[in-house]
Amino acid sequence: MTWWNRRNTKAITMLVKQIAALTAMLTVLSCAGCATSSPNDNEQSQSSDSSQTHEQVKKSAEQSIDGAHLRDNESLYKVYDDSGVETMYLTVSRGNSSEGTDHSWSEINQYSVDDYAAMGVDRYKVNGLLQVGDEQGPVSGELGFGESAPNATVQIRGQSSSKNEQKNYKIELKSGKGKWRGQRTIALNKHMGEGLRFRNKMAYDLIKGIDQMMGLRTQFVHLYVKDETSGSDSFDDYGLYTQVEQLNKTALQVHGLD
C-alpha cells in the first residue's frame, strides 16, 4: 500500500468515527425533552377518575341485522292492474321562456343529449296536457279529464337513446295538477333497440316474484300526441311505450326504502 493510499484510509476512518460520535450526541439531545410519568402523576389521574360520577341511562339491546331481509312493498303492485295497456293522450303546446317551455315539438324531437351538451343549454321543454283514458278518448275520473290548460311539461329522456328517431319522453306533472298512480314524473320508454319491445317490462314483472329483489312499477302505454305547436288539431298515434316508475324520493318512500 502506497503512502497516499494509507493516508486516505486513515482520513476515512477518522471521518467515520466523527459521524458516529455526532449521531450519538444527537440521539441524547433528542431524548432530553422526553417527559416521563411519575408515580405521583398516575395517582393523580386515578384519583381524578374515581371522583367522577355518571348519570345512569337505559340502553336498548343491540339488534342484529343478520336476520333482516330486504323486502319490497308487495301490496304496491296490487293496487293497479298493470297487465294491460293504458291509453294516454298528450297535447303539447308552446309555453314561455321563464319556464323554459318556449319551444316547438319539432325542436324537442330534433336534438340529442350530445347536441344539448354542444350548445351548452338544458334540454328543451314544452307545455303538455296529459289525459288518461281508453281508445275512445279521455275517461272521466282519470287524470286530465275535462281540462284544457297544460298540466305538465315534456322533454326527452335517456342518454344514447336520445339519438334515436323515436324518442323517450319524461312527462313532469305540475304541482297541484294531480298525480297518475301516485306519480308526478312519468317516464315513457320506446326501446327502439329492443325488437320485441316487452323485455324491459317482463324483467320487472319477474323481479316482483323474487324475494329480496327490489323492482319498479311498469305499465304498457299506447301514446297519442296532438302537436299544437305545428297547428295540428288531431292526435297522432305514437305507438306502444313502456312506462317505468321514476326512481326518486317518492318511489323510495312507497317501496319502503326511505
What is each stretch, according to the model?
Residues 1-14:
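N-terminal secretory signal peptides that target proteins for export/translocation
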Residues 6-7, 19-20, 39:
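Generic early N-terminus positional signal peaking at residue ~5-7
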Residues 15-36:
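Sec-dependent N-terminal signal peptides of Gram-positive bacterial secreted proteins and lipoproteins
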Residues 34-258:
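Phosphate/dinucleotide-binding and metal-coordinating scaffold of catalytic cores
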